[in-house]
């Protein structure tokens, strides 16, 4: 019986997200959104990221789609509440960009970065979201995005 319980625990653990911390924005990195005509998506894993102390990188840029941009921003605002470290920029009470760090139980952190690409528009239609995992520090990643 103990073996069965252990096997179920292992299978369940393997079936969960590969990311160190699960976030609401994960729902945005699904095939039907990433292949939408208003979305440009990038995913990178492996040796290319080693020099940046990252193990995973994925991003989506939404252009000219208020519904998708608003949904992404709503998820980001929810996730920001879970961040252990954050930096945000606002203008007239409007969130323009955010950089968030999420600590995990293992030696990797998860990082979420976003910015509005049309900050002066009345309606948010363009947004970029970058989701990363690795051992880089908050300051190292901020330097990469300057």
Predicted segments — roles?
Residues 19-109, 117-123, 137-139, 143-146:
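Polybasic/polar functional segments that serve as interface/processing modules
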Residues 1-25:
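Bacterial Sec-dependent N-terminal signal peptides
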Residues 133-135:
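Short, well-ordered, aromatic-rich surface patches in folded extracellular/luminal domains
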């Amino acid at each position: 019986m103990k073996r069965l319980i252990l096997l179920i625990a292992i299978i369940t653990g393997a079936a969960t997200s590969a990311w160190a911390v699960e976030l609401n924005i994960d729902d945005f990195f699904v095939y039907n959104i990433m292949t939408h005509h208003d979305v440009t998506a990038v995913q990178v894993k492996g040796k290319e990221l080693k020099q940046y102390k990252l193990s995973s990188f994925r991003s989506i840029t939404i252009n000219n789609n208020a519904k998708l941009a608003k949904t992404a921003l709503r998820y980001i605002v929810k996730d920001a509440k879970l961040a252990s470290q954050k930096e945000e920029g606002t203008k007239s009470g409007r969130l323009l960009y955010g950089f968030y760090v999420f600590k995990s139980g293992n030696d990797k952190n998860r990082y979420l970065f976003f910015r509005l690409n049309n900050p002066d528009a009345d309606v948010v239609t363009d947004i970029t979201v970058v989701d990363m995992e690795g051992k880089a520090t908050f300051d190292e990643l901020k330097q990469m995005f300057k």
